[in-house]
């Protein structure tokens, strides 16, 4: 089936307070974010038309703008309302929502002191990120040569557009070698994350996940930790070295887009989709379809 370009679709996109026809939601060529990566975004999922963890994502977008020294005139409630409106007007059941704040075209050059921060929200049907086969058999990862940077080198806890450059390079490298995605190490050589998801492994029935000190502490990551604790599964947030992957019984990835996706291969190491992964995944899938008051 041919891919439908994202700039040529039916529907509507919320842009700076107005709901525009999808194809008319455009920015100028000299937009600062296009040249310098000065943007912050979020990714949310809705299930049966209900957005999961909406407040948390809206607050994180505001905090990301603060980290990027971007003065945004919208509140978290404004962002949440725009997301809800985008889902409603596009009649989305199970789908994905992408809010994006970016610096505009008022000023060109590295400095952006005079540039206005814009906000847009798109929503579209998107049932699965990795696909049904990956869900059953696990995705295949290749360790990337690109490293996650130190907190001294970049605002690593912001979901900033510019930080995804190395993720794109890593994913292309993996796909060209026949893998699904990359496993990225950090600047110290420790296991960090995938290009757009957090990493968990199971050892002796307990969960281990890298300490989120140089990458995004994902909202789904924190949700999975809560699920595990409620199930009585011990969780270790710690430094994980690549050689430890040989002793992992199960591995899985978590993220808003990825949800809970098992990992079947890392380089030349293979893993089964085991009972802990299935339990966590099943609990998460039940939670995302609960009313907001019960899923909190």
Q: What is the meaning of each model-derived region?
A:
Residues 1-85, 89, 110-296:
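Helix-start/capping segments and mature chain N-termini
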